[in-house]
Amino acid sequence: MSRSPLNLSRRTMMAALGLGAGAAGLAACGAPNGGGGGSADGSVRDGFSQADLTVPSEYEGRTPILFWAPFTGVNYEVLAEQFAAFNESQDEIVAIAESVGGYADLNQKFTAALQARTVPDIVCFPEMQWLQFYNSDALAPLDSYFDDEWNLDVYIDNYVAEGKAAGETFVVPFARSTPLFYYNKTRYIEAGLPEEGPETWEDLAEFAPELAKIEVEGRPLAALAVGADDAWHAQADIWGFGGANANEDFAVTINEDAGVEWLEWQRKFIHEDKFGYMAQAAGTDFASGITAGMRGSTAGLTGTTAATEGVFEVGTAFMLSKEGQEKQVPTGGSGLSIVRSDSQDRHDACAELFRFLAQPEKSAEWHAGTGYVPIVKAAADTQTVKDLVAENPNYGVALAQLENARTADYTNWDQGSVTEIGAAQAQVYGDGADPKKVLDALAATLQETLDDNREDYEAVEFEGWN
């Protein structure tokens, strides 16, 4: 199995950026923690200028800050609304958001930008994948900006540790999520199944034959569509079978008995029982009614609800587990980071934007517009969130599942390994390959990567294992 070019260790990244060995010690460090309005003196990085952007004429003369946003569609539209509100709330800063596609697109674009030394002011990487850029000294610490009104205590606890390294904060939570099990409630009711959906994989296996009695476009209705890039969902799956991708001692365990059992269950369900299949776009198939189930992000809840309005009722449930096993889901989504550049004024302006977005009502609006978790604790008490849950209980399911959220295993801390996991799953989901052989080959690749990154990960002094 080939190693992905996105899988960059600190040494690889430093070499790619043309930085000598002496640069490895130049960790981004800020001033001692101070009050609000402070600045992270020492995080300025000469020679790294701002990437091109266009400032609307009505905002000329303000300090411009550029966010390369890994969002498209509805989520990007809601982000643009939040940025517009920030720009109207004051007269010194203009925040510009530019959609760059998804997380993998951002990873590639930002890596190239660092090499060219023309960078955005804000980036937003998923889970722990920001570490490769922290390790190349590309991100500025945030702690000196915190005060009594804006600090890490305002955010949901499960997500805070993922933004810290070696005692400093480099990411504040923003577009955070968990995976959910989505199902076609209308079809479940038609099939005489519990309208609250399945709780376990055994439930889904029991429900699938009843769903298959319903024909859609001349074919039996599938119980589940999976994607070729299901590595995030698979983290919940393997935990739900009592296994793990890796342990806290940096040993890859994805090919142990629990992992093989999980992937063999999926192989049989798809290729022998014919109750599921690998889709090019599971979300599209779900919205069109071809499949009665899929796994998706809470961040897709608003869009999925809109896409199926008037067609069928969407139901959501916690991610499935094997009967008798603990339900756990990986934290997902991303947080906001300031990119080290040649302007302290822009760094400070970014922090003001982060402070604005951490207001409870703004967090609630982001949640309502997208489905991302209302990451600010106080947002749950806003009328916006209360009304939303009352109108659509699926949002309440997403909130209730947060107690099961935990940080993904080390294997999921970099984009390259995530890509490798997805490719391995696709061999089983799509081709019916032998799970044990696939996982053994995958484990060897993942272990090589983890060994390469271990020193960097240990230096993080991660505080979030639970």
Where are these regions (language model features)?
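Glycine-centered hinge/linker elements that transmit conformational signals in sensory
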Residues: 207-210, 248-277, 319
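N-terminal secretory signal peptides
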Residues: 1-8, 15-24, 274
